[in-house]
Every structure is written in C-alpha cells, then in structure tokens.
Amino acid sequence: MKQPQIPVKMLTTLTILMVFLCIGSYLLSPKWQAVRAEYQRQRDPLHQFASQQNPEAQLQALQDKIRANPQNSEQWALLGEYYLWQNDYSNSLLAYRQALQLRGENAELYAALATVLYYQASQHMTAQTRAMIDKALALDSNEITALMLLASDAFMQANYAQAIELWQKVMDLNSPRINRTQLVESINMAKLLQRRSD
C-alpha cells in the first residue's frame, strides 16, 4: 500500500515554522531577557564604575551599620549623603543633623547641610543655607564644599567674577577632593560668559 507523500514545500514550511516558534519562545522567556540585560550592561562604557549594590541594598547596609553602632557620626553622614543622592532632602537633613549632634561642630557637616538646603530650595540661596555656609567657613575658611556651593550659586546668579574667584581659590587648595579638569572648564565657561555680558 502506498503511503501519501507530504509535499516538500509543506515540510519546508513546517520546519521553518518550528524554528521560528522555538526562537520566538526563547526570545519571550525570562532567560533571554536576563541575557539581553547583561549584554546591554556589558556594553555600557561605565558599567565597571556602577555600584554593584542596588539602592535598597545600599540603604539597608547603611542602616544595619547604624543600628550596630548608633553613635558613629560617619555612618550618619554617609546616610545623609545617600539620601541627598536620592533627592530625599528631609531624610538627608535628619541624618546630617544626627551626625552633627554626635560629632559636634564640623565644617564638612555644616557644608553638607547647606548643600541639602540649597537643593531643597531648588538651587536658591536661602538665609538658612547661607547660615550653614557661614558656620562651615567660620570653622574652616577653606571648606571645599562650602566654597563650591558659593561659586555655583554665584555662577547661577550671573556673578561670573565671584564664581571665577571662588573656583580659583578652590583649585589653589590642591585638594584631592576636587576635579581639576572640571574646575578649569567651569572657570573657562564663566570667563566666556563674563566676556559676552560685558
């Protein structure tokens, strides 16, 4: 008895359809999504600099350290910095104030508080922000964060001469905390804008 022959075209079509179904189901699987995400992460030129922890894990780690040693002002300051980077200004202020209470008068902490207040006020210099800067500079006339905040505000207010003077002062300190290239660029930009406004 002769079996019916399946046409070659139909076999080819079924084979191609099966291949597409297999590829399609793989592309829709969570494994493919993970492979694709990792590929994109590897292609990011800054992936080596990215934090290995997600923000929630960083927060949890900081909170655990504080619970273990609640008198550690440095950990409270790091928590304030974490919240600042998350744009959570009220919690940042609370953490920095706790660090200040534990450490006592400290120029860096006053400058950090000024920074939070400045960004909380949408980059406007308020009386409270200025008071924190003044306290920081009274304790350390070369406090970099306070000077940088004053320079940035002067630049935002189109007071380019003052911005240049402050940035130059910061650069002359030769602190490892500063990015000299960025400072030079800021000074050059202020000089350019100053010439245009004259």
Swiss-Prot record:
Gene3D superfamilies with a match to the protein in the record: Tetratricopeptide repeat domain (1.25.40.10)
Listed PANTHER family: CYTOCHROME C-TYPE BIOGENESIS PROTEIN CCMH (PTHR47870), CYTOCHROME C-TYPE BIOGENESIS PROTEIN CYCH (PTHR47870:SF4)
SMART domains: TPR (SM00028)
Keyword Hydrolase (UniProt): no
TPR repeat ranges per the UniProt record: 73-106, 144-177
Tree of life domain: Bacteria
Keywords: Repeat, TPR repeat
Listed name of the protein: Formate-dependent nitrite reductase complex subunit NrfG
InterPro entries registered for this protein in UniProt: C-type_cytochrome_biogenesis (IPR051263), TPR-like_helical_dom_sf (IPR011990), TPR_CcmH_CycH (IPR056413), TPR_rpt (IPR019734)
Function: Required for formate-dependent nitrite reduction. Not required for the biosynthesis of any of the c-type cytochromes nor for the secretion of the periplasmic cytochromes.
Species this protein is from: Escherichia coli O157:H7
Cellular component GO terms, alphabetical: plasma membrane
Annotated Pfam families: TPR_CcmH_CycH
Family matches, as SUPFAM superfamilies: TPR-like (SSF48452)
